[in-house]
Amino acid sequence: MDITLTIFAQALAFAGLIWIVATKIWPPLLQAIEERQQKIAEGLAAADRSQKDLAQAQEKVNEALKDARTKANEIIDQAHARANQIIEAAKLEAIAEANRQKDLAQTEIDASATRAREELRKQVSVLAVSGAEKLLKREIDANAHKALLDELAAEI
């Protein structure tokens, strides 16, 4: 065999190999590579969307926490205000009850004082009548009168 014929046969075989590879092997290989690239691109896009969704969810969570803290502070403030109102109402009620008890005690004291005065008037009137009887029974004497009046004053 001649070298030219050998080179020509090899060139023909190589061209046949290239044609087989280009028509039968290369298109499915390119299709597989493109599908893989598309899947990778979709995965990257999904990862980007997931990161954006995560960031949005984190913002929503932070906003919800902020709202919850605000509402909790409002509830705490309302509770403090209500507690202060209850305390103030209890103070006013206690003051009113103390004043009522004081008024009752004062009324009782006044009644006792009135009864004591009446009792003293009765006793004074009895003593005055008794003293007048003694004065009238004795003889009229300035020293005796003075002694009786001193005795009455001591009894009163």
Curated annotation (Swiss-Prot):
GO molecular function: proton-transporting ATP synthase activity, rotational mechanism; proton-transporting ATPase activity, rotational mechanism
Subcellular compartments: Cell inner membrane
Membrane topology label: Single-pass membrane protein
Main location: membrane
Transmembrane recorded as keyword: yes
Source taxon at top rank: Bacteria
Positions of transmembrane segments: 3-23
Cellular component GO terms held in the UniProt record: plasma membrane; proton-transporting ATP synthase complex
Alphabetized UniProt keyword annotations: ATP synthesis, Cell inner membrane, Cell membrane, CF(0), Hydrogen ion transport, Ion transport, Membrane, Transmembrane, Transmembrane helix, Transport
Transport keyword on record: yes
PANTHER family: ATP SYNTHASE SUBUNIT B, ATP SYNTHASE SUBUNIT B', CHLOROPLASTIC
Assembly and oligomerization: F-type ATPases have 2 components, F(1) - the catalytic core - and F(0) - the membrane proton channel. F(1) has five subunits: alpha(3), beta(3), gamma(1), delta(1), epsilon(1). F(0) has three main subunits: a(1), b(2) and c(10-14). The alpha and beta chains form an alternating ring which encloses part of the gamma chain. F(1) is attached to F(0) by a central stalk formed by the gamma and epsilon chains, while a peripheral stalk is formed by the delta and b chains.
NCBIfam families: ATP_synt_b, PRK05759.1-2
Cited function: F(1)F(0) ATP synthase produces ATP from ADP in the presence of a proton or sodium gradient. F-type ATPases consist of two structural domains, F(1) containing the extramembraneous catalytic core and F(0) containing the membrane proton channel, linked together by a central stalk and a peripheral stalk. During catalysis, ATP synthesis in the catalytic domain of F(1) is coupled via a rotary mechanism of the central stalk subunits to proton translocation. Component of the F(0) channel, it forms part of the peripheral stalk, linking F(1) to F(0).
Record-stated family: Belongs to the ATPase B chain family.
Protein name: ATP synthase subunit b
